[in-house]
């Protein structure tokens, strides 16, 4: 029974480690790093395995535009859609201090490309890119209940998200046949958000039977900084309208994720099916919410598979979007108030995200 629970929880938390709120497109929910260290007590009490390393690969392609929940199908039909390709390599090292406490550090490496017409001359499609270290996160975790005495448990975590990613990354924009300007790339492919943030996590599991368990994860990033000063003019001059509504510089938004689901384990193989909600809210909990942001959320069904090789777990999880919603931003609301005409911007979303990786103990 203990071994089954151990495999189940390892499979559950591998993805909690590596899938902390990440974008599926222009809603710029980027990798914030992080591993939660929830393993079963039989592994936690093994003093010979105090270290844990997780490597996660994440990829998505976003190209379907939404205003609210309404898809703008004409964007794909007329070839004006924005296409983002996003790859993240998350490297996370965890130290188990004892059966109660653990600490971790995560370093995401990002490689992004963005293809569009409107950012350039409006007629031809060009690419902008970004590559480098993202925002590093350090965290501490503790079990609520004694891991040795329960078939379910709750783990809480607090962390610090550092502004290590370049939030003013630049590339060239083609304005016409003879003019190319250098400017900050779109917010959705910036390597960081420029703010120091604070994270809180709750991770839980409960074994329903020898083979079936339930899990849940909650993650929230608090970003006190309101704006990071990065221009949204792509190397040009900000318009009077963008300055008036505050969208001329990039915002530093909060973000959160909620996951819940069930797992079925047979020997070393675990199959899971869950629900996932990723959100970049309109308003932050702390600090202001002005500046340019594309708020919204993605609701996904999340199937997954994990296989245990004693000290190594390999896994694949593929959240598939079932609802995408680009909500009205603060800048949209200000413009609506100033003009009397309802304004709500769009955002491009992916159909699915691929997460593949492994965790090993030593």
Task: Go through each PLM region and give its residues.
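Residues on the lipid-exposed face of transmembrane beta-strands in outer-membrane beta-barrel proteins
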Residues: 43, 55-57, 91-95, 105, ...
């Amino acid at each position: 029974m203990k071994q089954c629970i151990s495999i189940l929880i390892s499979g559950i938390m591998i993805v909690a480690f590596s899938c902390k709120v990440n974008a599926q497109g222009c809603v710029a929910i980027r990798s914030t790093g992080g591993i939660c260290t929830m393993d079963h007590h039989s592994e936690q009490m093994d003093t010979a395995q105090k270290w844990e390393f997780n490597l996660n690969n994440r990829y998505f392609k976003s190209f379907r535009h939404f205003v609210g929940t309404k898809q703008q199908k004409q964007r794909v039909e007329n070839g004006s859609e924005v296409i983002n390709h996003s790859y993240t390599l998350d490297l996370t090292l965890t130290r188990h201090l004892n059966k109660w406490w653990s600490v971790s550090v995560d370093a995401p490496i990002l490689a992004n490309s963005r293809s569009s017409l409107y950012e350039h001359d409006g007629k031809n499609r060009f690419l902008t890119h970004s590559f480098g270290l993202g925002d590093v996160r350090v965290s501490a975790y503790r079990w609520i209940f004694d891991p040795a005495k329960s078939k379910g448990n709750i783990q809480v975590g607090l962390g610090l998200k550092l502004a290590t990613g370049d939030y003013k990354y630049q590339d060239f924009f083609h304005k016409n046949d003879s003019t190319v300007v250098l400017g900050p790339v779109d917010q959705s492919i910036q390597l960081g958000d420029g703010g120091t943030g604070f994270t809180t996590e709750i991770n839980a599991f409960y074994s329903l039977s020898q083979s079936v368990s339930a899990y849940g994860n909650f993650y929230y990033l608090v970003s006190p900084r309101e704006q990071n000063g990065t221009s949204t003019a792509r190397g040009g001059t900000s318009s009077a309208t963008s300055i008036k509504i505050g969208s001329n510089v990039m915002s530093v938004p909060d973000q959160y994720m909620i996951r819940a689901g069930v797992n079925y384990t047979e020997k070393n193989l675990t199959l899971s099916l869950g629900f996932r909600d990723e959100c970049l809210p309109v308003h932050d909990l702390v600090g202001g919410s002005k500046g340019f942001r594309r708020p919204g959320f993605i609701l996904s069904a999340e199937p997954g598979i994990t296989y245990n090789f004693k000290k190594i777990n390999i896994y694949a999880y593929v959240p598939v979007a079932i609802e995408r919603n680009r909500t009205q931003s603060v800048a949209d609301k200000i413009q609506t108030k100033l003009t009397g005409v309802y304004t709500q911007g769009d955002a491009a979303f992916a159909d699915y995200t691929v997460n593949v990786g492994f965790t090993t103990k030593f």
